[in-house]
A protein has these predicted regions:
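A short beta-loop-alpha structural element at the N-terminal edge
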Residues: 23-38
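A conserved beta-strand-loop-helix scaffold within acyl/acetyltransferase catalytic domains
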Residues: 47-105
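Conserved GNAT acetyl-CoA-binding A-motif
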Residues: 128-139
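Conserved active-site alpha-helix within GNAT-family acetyltransferase domains
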Residues: 1-2, 114, 118, 142-157
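Acyl-donor-binding surface of acyltransferase catalytic domains
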Residues: 1-21
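A conserved short alpha-helix in the GNAT/GCN5 acetyltransferase fold that borders
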Residues: 112, 121-129
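A short, internal acetyl-CoA/4′-phosphopantetheine-binding micro-motif in the GNAT/acyltransferase core
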Residues: 103-112, 141
Length: 157
């Protein structure tokens, strides 16, 4: 049975910068949908929620009021997208402050272990903090040991 964990961290606590030489750009709704979709489906090939997306799935998310391409970070190597961190701000919480989410995070397996995921997540957290968000959260499968380890280093619990 699949178990999903919801992890949190304060954005009032310091966000440790990550030194890297990666090229980060933000998602362009005209240029990147098909390229991002190919990578997303490759990374999440057997994932029940995130895998096997069609362009309509992405377009549905992009039409949501929370979608902001400035919070959708891509790592590019040799003009190819190799990783991403897509953030989301939940504004619809009754009597609560908005909360930021690291919505979808992925790195091509050919580039795993290089620190791309950590650098992208850090970029996402810095973006959320700059938007005035004080709390961040994410969902992760309980059996995703690599993801849980990464998120712990970023202050999530």
């Amino acid at each position: 049975m699949r178990r999903i964990l919801k992890l949190h961290r304060s954005l009032q606590a310091p966000i440790s910068p990550v030194t890297h030489n990666f090229e980060f750009i933000t998602f362009n709704t005209q240029l990147h949908p098909k390229l991002w979709l190919e990578l997303n489906n490759k990374i999440f090939i057997s994932h029940p929620d995130q895998g096997n997306w069609a362009i309509a799935d992405l377009e549905n998310r992009m039409s949501e009021p929370w979608f902001d391409p400035r919070g959708f970070f891509l790592c590019v190597i040799n003009e190819k997208i190799v990783g991403f961190c897509w953030t989301k701000i939940h504004q619809d919480l009754v009597n609560k402050e908005p909360i930021g989410e690291l919505y979808v995070i992925g790195v091509d397996s050919a580039h795993s272990g290089k620190g791309i995921g950590k650098a992208l997540c850090t970029e996402g957290l810095i973006y959320l903090k700059a938007k005035g968000i004080t709390q961040a959260m994410l969902y992760v499968d309980e059996d995703n040991e690599a993801g849980k380890g990464l998120y712990k280093t970023l202050g999530f619990n």
